[in-house]
Amino acid sequence: MQALPNNLQETGAPDFVLFSSPGGNDALLGLPFNEAIDNINSIIDVLQNANPDITIIIELMAPGHSNMMTPELTTYFEQLQQGILSICEEQTSSNSSVVAVDMYTGFSDVYLADDVHYNVTGADFIAQRYYTLLATLLE
């Protein structure tokens, strides 16, 4: 997060951002839920300040492997899903859209190479979800 403003200055602000697994590392590190939401909002704020007309596609994150999804982590993920939907509503403006893409529904252990990273089949699943949404947004 700290390097993001400088990186945007060096590279220029994008028109589209695919925001993958927002809050995922925060959840795995055991950070408080509100801190994860604040971190996601801060990243979006930096992106929108760099380009007020930006479109941000943010994931409703796929779950980790069922072996690691404790009841506490499952609750955290479910809270993130709702929090991200709220962020989309709150951060969308007349110029900038923040749109959720559902990676959670239909995702299963067969899509994972380890506890949290996609295998080739999982990458295809994720890519198809992005493609479907991007095709609609770019029409």
Where are the regions a protein language model picked out?
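Second-shell loop/turn segments in exported
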Residues: 25-33, 70-71, 112-118
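N-terminal cationic-hydrophobic initiation segments that often serve targeting/anchoring roles
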Residues: 8-9, 44-49, 88-92
